[in-house]
Curated annotation (Swiss-Prot):
<protein>
    <recommendedName>
        <fullName>UPF0246 protein Jann_0444</fullName>
    </recommendedName>
</protein>
<dbReference type="Pfam" id="PF03883">
    <property type="entry name" value="H2O2_YaaD"/>
</dbReference>
<comment type="similarity">
    <text>Belongs to the UPF0246 family.</text>
</comment>
<dbReference type="InterPro" id="IPR005583">
    <property type="entry name" value="YaaA"/>
</dbReference>
<dbReference type="GO" id="GO:0033194">
    <property type="term" value="P:response to hydroperoxide"/>
</dbReference>
<dbReference type="GO" id="GO:0005829">
    <property type="term" value="C:cytosol"/>
</dbReference>
Length: 258
């Protein structure tokens, strides 16, 4: 199976002694970085609803994107958000990382689609950004059906018809489902609360990363196998599930123990 996850806003730029690969859409990343480079700090601040300090940081990054003075890092280890706490890519063994190179993809506003070891440069460009290009008024328009098509090609290469979607709605919306020839399975993660089961953003993001790791480590090949997911105290919750959306629930006791 293929699994997709979102990137992260935060980066960990610690140097890693790992061989990297070249992103498939590097030319597009340069094109988009040039478009972002033309924007003022105020424009970037408005584009991504970020602070003045973050706008300056990313304006400076886009100015030197092609020179890459800060070097490059493997994507799965450079991203440092909630999903990546769950993924824990730094502790994956070499064989599992090799497997993930073929079976795990990271959706990206700038790079389109990344393998775990693809080399990235420091950036922030969220998929929902309305960055105008010759292809349209947003990154969704820019990428069009190409990310779905790339997933189709990779799915064929690993002989699967299933895509495990562990990405956010914002990022998975960049995958044109009409162009996707795969069955989509989107796990949902709930916390048991006094008022009933509830999706809590931080925990759900972390669980999506943990699910991505679970699929890679166990080399899962069928969607029913993900129902055994138990990382962090979650268990399959049939009553909360829907077709294509298996649910997992964590009890209050498991929450406290985590």
């Amino acid at each position: 199976m293929l699994t997709v996850i979102s990137p992260a806003k935060r980066l960990d730029w610690a140097k890693r002694e790992l061989a990297t690969t070249a992103p498939d859409f590097m030319d597009d990343a340069v094109t988009l970085a040039r478009a972002a480079k033309r924007l003022s700090q105020a424009d970037l601040r408005k584009l991504m609803d970020i602070s003045a300090d973050l706008a300056k940081l990313n304006a400076d990054r886009f100015k030197v994107f092609e020179e890459a003075p800060e070097g490059e890092r493997p994507a799965a280890l450079a991203f440092a958000g909630d999903t990546y706490i769950g993924l824990e890519a730094t502790s994956l063994d070499a064989d599992t990382m090799d497997y993930a190179q073929d079976h795990l993809r990271i959706l990206s506003g700038l790079y389109g689609l990344l393998r775990p070891l693809d080399a990235i440069r420091p950036y922030r460009l969220e998929m929902g950004s309305r960055l105008k290009t010759r292809k349209g008024p947003s990154l969704y328009a820019y990428w069009g059906p190409r990310l779905a098509q790339a997933l189709n090609v990779q799915a064929k290469a690993v002989d699967t018809k299933t895509l495990i979607n562990c990405a956010s709605v914002e990022y998975f919306s960049a995958v044109d489902e009409k162009a996707l020839d795969l069955d989509i399975v989107t796990p949902q993660f709930f916390e048991d609360k006094p008022g009933g089961p509830k999706i809590v953003s931080f925990f759900a993001k972390k669980a999506r990363g943990a699910m991505a790791r679970f699929v890679q480590e166990r080399r899962l090949t069928s969607p029913h196998q993900i129902l055994d997911f138990d990382t962090g105290g979650y268990s399959h919750a049939p009553d909360l599930s829907a077709p294509g959306k298996p649910a997992f629930l964590r009890s209050e006791a498991a929450q406290k123990a985590a």
